[in-house]
Amino acid sequence: MFKSGFVTIVGRPNVGKSTLLNAIMKEKLSIVSCRPQTTRNNIQTILTEDNYQLVFVDTPGIHKPKHKLGEYMVKSASDAMKDVDLVLFLINPDEKPGRGDLFIIEQLKEVKVPVFLVLNKIDENPQEKVAETLKTYSELMEFEEIIPISALKGKNIDLLKELMFKYIPEGPQYYPEDMIIDQNERFIVAEIVREKALRLLSEEVPHGIAVEILQMKKNEKGTYHIEGNILCEKNSHKPIIIGKGGSKLKKISQYARQDIEAFLQSKVYIRLWVKVKEEWRDNQSLLKELGYKNMK
């Protein structure tokens, strides 16, 4: 008997959805940063085992939108809860249910599929706090399963997989067994660069950056030559991203190259520039060019 199902992970921004997905896959597939809203596009990730296939949709965190990109991110996360077989609602025990959580719960009450409550970061919180959080959320909604985990340390991830297998239906293998992600290489490369930029930049440049891959060529020796732009919204942000004598941009390039080489399994040369694109997050045509799907 072979089983297959689509699973979506939802939760407030920065709750650890991408870290959880990476723990399940044991691969660095989804951009992970300490900043909220770092996942901007639905990424379908495929886990194939001998007797089942799980297709995960890693969504942006649900938040109040402030621009067209924000509107897209919220719609993208909400749409992901439709037409799936299982929903994982990820929370942190050290945070009381806020307006965002209550908004998500109201949406979850409308779905017709099993919903798991997954408590992350249990290793960072006392048992009393975890128990208190469980009680609070259980009173707000009934969940098919409640699983405490540590996504960062991999605790109870195997248990979570076993429970997901239990709830998904019998079905075909939708993707080839060697396929782990449905985004193209350029998208992944751009996300890796953006992650490094977010990690290295100060709070002066929050989410107003994007990465545009201009060229990605592989020579006869198997080496990739990549060129790209880091886009920012303000002229004042450009020198911050570049750094003194180009030091910050150089670090972004170095750290990105290491992860890109691991992803592509090839040697990589990368050159990055910084360009100012004012209000790019409200530019629908540019958002489409940057890979944000279904923009209307």
UniProtKB/Swiss-Prot annotation:
Function description: An essential GTPase that binds both GDP and GTP, with rapid nucleotide exchange. Plays a role in 16S rRNA processing and 30S ribosomal subunit biogenesis and possibly also in cell cycle regulation and energy metabolism.
Bilayer topology: Peripheral membrane protein
GO cellular component: cytosol; plasma membrane
Domain annotation Era-type G: ranges: 3-170
Cellular compartments annotated: Cytoplasm; Cell membrane
Chain positions covered by the region annotation G1: 11-18
Keywords assigned: Cell membrane, Cytoplasm, GTP-binding, Membrane, Nucleotide-binding, Ribosome biogenesis, RNA-binding, rRNA-binding
Region (G2): 37-41
Family matches, as PANTHER family: GTPASE ERA (PTHR42698), GTPASE ERA, MITOCHONDRIAL (PTHR42698:SF1)
Region spans: G5: 149-151
Quaternary context: Monomer.
Chief location: cytoplasm
Family (UniProt): Belongs to the TRAFAC class TrmE-Era-EngA-EngB-Septin-like GTPase superfamily. Era GTPase family.
Lineage of the species this protein comes from: Bacteria, Bacillati, Bacillota, Clostridia, Eubacteriales
GO function term, MF aspect, one: ribosomal small subunit binding
Ranges where the record places region G3: 58-61
Protein name: GTPase Era
Matches recorded under Pfam families: KH_2, MMR_HSR1
Binding site residues for GTP: 11-18, 58-62, 120-123
GO biological process: ribosomal small subunit assembly
KH type-2 domain ranges (all copies): 201-278
UniProt-annotated stretches for the region G4: 120-123
